[in-house]
């Protein structure tokens, strides 16, 4: 179901204790989803923002950002991972994105064309988590192969708060583990 309030705290608790959790949340970007979850968790428990951010990024290391475009189509615009580094800082990695290749007005209607692109491979820590939670190595290898087919210059890990990580905006957000 959709997270709208204090149930965000229960969702992250369930996800961090081995339960599969799939939920949606409204926010303005893939990266903003984690901050929105922190805000919702604070409706239930008053904790430091950094502590709550640690909890929600551990519970939901990957967000899937969907948006309704001007032509009324819905697209997955971005899939992003948040990795907590050994020093406690966070790194946001865009894994996949939808790149608009053409935006045109035809017969009074908008038409948007684009392609989904692999951008940056998942972190070693998430790869390990996938395998430990039952992903067959063959599937992980297939996933990782999708990143090897892109140009290295397109890689885009961002440190927390970088401008490049905050450029995507939208009206809908889907978050899943």
Which residues fall in each region the model found?
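Conserved P-loop NTPase nucleotide-binding/switch module
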Residues: 1-81
